[in-house]
Amino acid sequence: MVQLLYILNGGEVMSAIFPSAEWLKELEVKLNSDEKYAEIAKNWEGDLFFNIEPEGSLTEPLTFYLDLYHGKCRKVEYKPDAAIYPKPAFTLSASYNNITAVLTGKLNPMTAMMTMKLKVSGSMGYMMRNVPTVLDFVRVAQEVTSEIQ
């Protein structure tokens, strides 16, 4: 499991296990409070639907949804019904081991996409034009990820 820790603006230490609804909520809070992300992602418009394939300690498929818009995260949902979000801008699919490797910095997200360890459905042109936003999103996610057990 991934143990997540970070300090909020008020100095409160929070922790959650990846993957969990609590982790996803902490990611939302961090995305909405990170000034660097807000600046870099100010022109991004696109929601993300993640499919995490079971592997290792994850025994069943997992999904989560993020609505990212102009440097903010407007909504997150853990284990959403895919029918509620029939046409997200991007669908990202990866095995549990590959997604945790990206979250811990062991696997570069661009390398993961190019080698199909992280599969992306949606406008690759848009994503490639917005590589700084993609990389900073990953940076924020990595900052809330402190260790893998």
Regions found by a protein language model. Give the residues of each.
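Feature captures hydrophobic
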Residues: 4-149
